Curated annotation (Swiss-Prot):
UniProt-recorded Gene Ontology molecular function terms: prenyltransferase activity
Short name of one Pfam family: Trp_DMAT
Keywords assigned: Alkaloid metabolism, Prenyltransferase, Transferase
Stated family: Belongs to the tryptophan dimethylallyltransferase family.
Organism domain of life: Eukaryota
InterPro entries associated with the record: Aro_prenylTrfase_DMATS
Function: Prenyltransferase; part of the gene cluster that mediates the biosynthesis of paraherquamide, a fungal indole alkaloid that belongs to a family of natural products containing a characteristic bicyclo[2.2.2]diazaoctane core. The first steps in the biosynthesis of paraherquamide is the production of the beta-methyl-proline precursor from L-isoleucine. They require oxidation of a terminally hydroxylated L-isoleucine to the corresponding aldehyde by enzymes which have still to be identified.
Residue numbers binding dimethylallyl diphosphate: Y195, K262, Q332
Metabolic or biological pathway: Alkaloid biosynthesis
EC number(s) on file: 2.5.1.-
Gene Ontology BP, a term: alkaloid metabolic process
Broad enzyme group: transferase
Protein name: Prenyltransferase phqA
Amino acid sequence: MGSINIVTPYMKIGQYLSFRNRDHFSWWHQKGPVLSQMLQACHYGVHEQYQYLTLFYAHLIPALGAYTEPSVGQKGNTLLSGAGRLELSRTFTVDDSSLRIAFEPTSFLASEKGTDPLNRVPLSRLLSVLGQLSGVSLGTDRYRTLADQLTTSDDDEEKLLNEPTLAEQLQSLPSRTQNILALELVNGFVKPELYFHPQMKALASGALVEDLLFDALRSVDSAGRLGKAIDLAKEFVQAAPTTTRPQFISYQIERSHSGAAKLFLTESAINWDQISGLWRYAQPETIQTEQNRALRVLWESLNVVEGNRGPNQFPIMMVLGLFAEEPFVRPQVAFPVVGMTEGAIARSIGRFFDNMGWKESSQSYVDGLRSYFPNEDLDQPLGKQAWVALSLFDSENPALTVFYY
């Protein structure tokens, strides 16, 4: 018998698409197949695959700007790994998995010589478009409040570009990212989350990043629902060593959502006590045992090396999820795996799944990775899997997220 050619929604849609330019063509043909394979691996229904692939083609690709192949550590890359402009992440739980797409909306005008040198325009335009789509629940009031406090204004831009000292400092920043938009794909709906990076705002205003972040969190939480969580996060930061640095926040901007935020911190002094201390912070004792086991299993599966990370090395990312209900603070720890071969990373993740008893994920992960990147040599360190993060899925049970580029 001959082989069976499986026709996917990606293939069917692609028969009828046209592209405005070569960059749009490249984004669809280079990243569309990866998204398609991941949607299938996560068991999204065929109608949902058509839905999310159409969203990618019609609304996300035009906001991705020039197509570039990921290059780890390249100056100007916008996402956490420094490995590219578009991030696909898959979150695994004991019996399920789901996808998220994250990127910095941009345009060809966002360059040093363009009319939007600090890339301030594309995000608001894209949010306006997405807010009109069926299945996308998006409220812009929180976005505006946070943007006013954490992103550059007209006056800030004028200062940063024209005052010699500030202009020189601006050039030394690793990137000019002010926002990342993440879209979680859930049961035919799209749940948006916005990330705010206030480094340029801090440079223009002279304020500390930490102060900007906490002031913004309290401002957007006008009803005080996150008050307890913000207080606990502030206490953690104040007690942390100088190697722990607040970097940015994210906020869920669903129209009907009561509001939940995350505070992201980098940690360059890597040791078990520091990381496990975060993992236990403000958690009820009744659920700490299983949490601690999951963190230890991941730590050992990745063979994390303790010690200080230098300026040219990736730190560990520690995250405090802030919620209105107990537990008010829910931790997340993200480990960089850039530099390891793709196969070694996959085997480490497989060991975690196996030790946690997540049999289906354990058996399918390596094959899934091969399907995402069928033409790559996975015995090389390619940066395709850049971060592995452990979090709490539903306030008690662990979830593992792998970030792909």
